[in-house]
Amino acid sequence: MMRLTLCFALAGAIWIQGLSDSTAQSLGFSKQGDGPIQIEADEGIEWQRAKQVYLAHGNARATQGGVSVEGDELIAHYKPNAAGENEIYRINANGNVRITSESEVAVSDNAVYDIDNGVLVMTGDTIRLDTAEDTIIARESLEYYEQQQMAIARGDALAIRDDRRLRADTLTAHFGEGGRSASMDRIEANGNVLVSTPTDIVRAEQGDYNPDRGLATLTGNVKITRGDTQLNGDRAEVNLTTGESRLLSSRSGERVRGLFLPKSSSGNGAGQPSNTGPTGNQ
C-alpha cells in the first residue's frame, strides 16, 4: 500500500513548535527547532479549505525532529495570521493516539491540543504517560497546562515511581524547571487517596506528595494498615522510600486510635502488638 506523505514547511512548524514548547518543560516532550513537519497517512490527506482544516486518515503520523504524534486520524485546524499565512491553532488526534519523544511516551484514545492557550487534553478509557522517572495513569482524562507547569490526571489516577504508588480520584502534578529533563516535584491527591509501600497501605481523603524525597503527607480519615495492625487518625506522614508510616494527632487534638489483633501462641503473645507495625503519635 502506498503511504501518502505531505510536508508543511510553515504550518507544520507552527504546530510542532507550539506542542513542543508547551509540553517540554513538564511532560518531557523534546523542544524542537522551526523545521518542517512531515505528515504521513495510509488512506489519504485532505485539505478542506472551506473548513480550514487538514485531515490525515489511516495510521496517520506527524513528525518533526524527535517528536512524533500518531493516531488513526489527525485533524489540524488553521486560521490566517497577520502575514496572510495559515497558522495552525488546534490539533485533534483520534483513535490509538501515541505521542513520543526521545524518552517519553503518552498514549490515549483521543487528544486535543489548544496551541493558543497552551492546553493539552488526552481522554479515553486508559491514558498513560511514561517519562524517564515517572508513570501517570488515568481513566478519564489527563490535562496539561503550559503556563502553570501543571498536569491533572482524573479518574482513578495513579502515579508510579519505582515501587512507590499514589492513587486518587484526581492527581495534580507540578513540574520543576529544567526543560526536557524536568520531573514532577509535587503531587496533590484528592479523593479516595491510597498510598502503598512494600509493607503498608495508607488511605485518606487528601494528600501532598514530594516524589524526589519520597514523602507524603495525608489528611482526612487516615487509615494505616500493616498486616493485622491498623491505626486511624486525621493526619499521617508516609516515607515511601523507607516504607515508614507515622500517624499524627489532628490539630484539633483528636486522639490517634490503634487496632492490634491478638497473635497466636507462636507469635508475640495474645493482645500484644507486632513490633513491626506503623508508629502513632498523640
Language model features with spans:
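Bacterial N-terminal signal peptides
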Residues: 5-17
